[in-house]
Amino acid sequence: MANTPNFEEEIHCSFCGKSASEVKKIVAGPNDVYICNECVALAEGIIEEELTVDRAAEVLSLPTPHEIVNELNDYVIGQEDAKKTLAVAVYNHYKRINENVAPTLDVELQKSNIALMGPTGSGKTYLAQSLARILNVPFAIADATTLTEAGYVGEDVENIILKLLQAADFDVAAAERGIIYVDEIDKIAKKSENVSITRDVSGEGVQQALLKMLEGTTASVPPQGGRKHPQQELIQVNTTNILFIVGGAFAGIDTIIKERLGERVIGFGSDANENAEALNDDNILHHVQPEDMTKFGLIPEFIGRLPIVTVLDELTISDLTRILTEPKNALIKQYTALLGLDDVELEFQPDALDAMASVAIKRHTGARGLRSIIENVMKDVMFDIPSRDDVAKVIITKASVEQGEQPELQLKKVSE
């Protein structure tokens, strides 16, 4: 006959078997299950150990600023000051993330987003892309000119986060450590300092919408894009650890800077002398101040979310010829490899490289215009070569670039 439970008996921990008199506390659960304070403490320790291992796995292996610059040098020519500034900023950003994962400090480290200023084709986008590649984190590019306030025709700011999610294969944890580059940020400057009856839906309104993203918020992201599928389930993404890099040419801000410096040159003293020297700087953007950006049309709150401002210089002919030949994935190396697949050598004469660089400068396209220039020069060659088996080498001359003459062809020697 089965024993009938005796409720007057002393209860025991269901895990270690100790009685109530042997421990400080026993907690009762459903179905006559009990756990003592000692087993609770033991379980807590096991869980904490596992969480520590998980947190350690989340800590990024972080290259030093020197290592970041050295790797950037493999891909980016020139812009030494910008590379150094970005390397330090990115290192500190991900060091901050690692600290948040496994805290050791009493101080809360805040995020510092980055603004890049420089002419078209100076390498702003490419620098941001290269940083993401070096750090092996998800990367997305957004165009500020397509963004509008919620409720207006255009893209919601949440779509920026969607692009990062897509780059991370919808791994939310990976996306939350990614880098977003917002291009043409100068195009969302306020149209005027005067209040207008017509709403500036792609200017100040977008700046306001981006504010929370930049400082850190939990964004509700529609996985299929913004407004076409209103019933879709939203993905929650915390932007606190996403590094935002914004870039723009800021055409016209040089005039604002000169006006400010010019007003302060009048008079005597070291400040007046410094301002006079600044006015003669080849790149006046190096002297930009938050007040200049405010006058340009960015609201103070938005500028405050971009504490790091770095300036890229306009590329010279020397810079552009180096860009054509030196980086690991230089265009000349790419086209040489392409013709090599057809068993044909490719040579660019030095003055041809200078000529291509000059064309890019005249067109004000910078580095991004080099590929189209090469494509134009190489078009007929790349059309004909696959159909010929007698060509050993193609030589691109200065005349090929400037006058549109056909490249020189060296034919294979006919064996007797």
Curated annotation (Swiss-Prot):
Keyword Chaperone: yes
Record GO terms (molecular function): ATP binding; ATP hydrolysis activity; ATP-dependent protein folding chaperone; protein dimerization activity; unfolded protein binding; zinc ion binding
Residues binding Zn(2+): C13, C16, C36, C39
Pfam families tied to this protein: AAA_2, ClpB_D2-small, zf-C4_ClpX
Binding of ATP, residues: P119, T120, G121, S122, G123, K124, T125, Y126
PROSITE patterns linked to this entry: CLPX_ZB
One Gene Ontology biological process: cell division
Signal peptide: none
Keyword Lipid biosynthesis in annotation: no
Entry's Gene Ontology cellular component terms: HslUV protease complex
The ClpX-type ZB domain, residue ranges: 1-55
Keywords per UniProt: ATP-binding, Chaperone, Metal-binding, Nucleotide-binding, Zinc
Complex formation: Component of the ClpX-ClpP complex. Forms a hexameric ring that, in the presence of ATP, binds to fourteen ClpP subunits assembled into a disk-like structure with a central cavity, resembling the structure of eukaryotic proteasomes.
Protein family (similarity comment): Belongs to the ClpX chaperone family.
HAMAP family: ClpX (MF_00175)
Classification via NCBIfam families: clpX (TIGR00382), PRK05342.1 (NF003745)
Described function: ATP-dependent specificity component of the Clp protease. It directs the protease to specific substrates. Can perform chaperone functions in the absence of ClpP.
Protein name, UniProt field: ATP-dependent Clp protease ATP-binding subunit ClpX
Originating organism: Leuconostoc mesenteroides subsp. mesenteroides (strain ATCC 8293 / DSM 20343 / BCRC 11652 / CCM 1803 / JCM 6124 / NCDO 523 / NBRC 100496 / NCIMB 8023 / NCTC 12954 / NRRL B-1118 / 37Y)
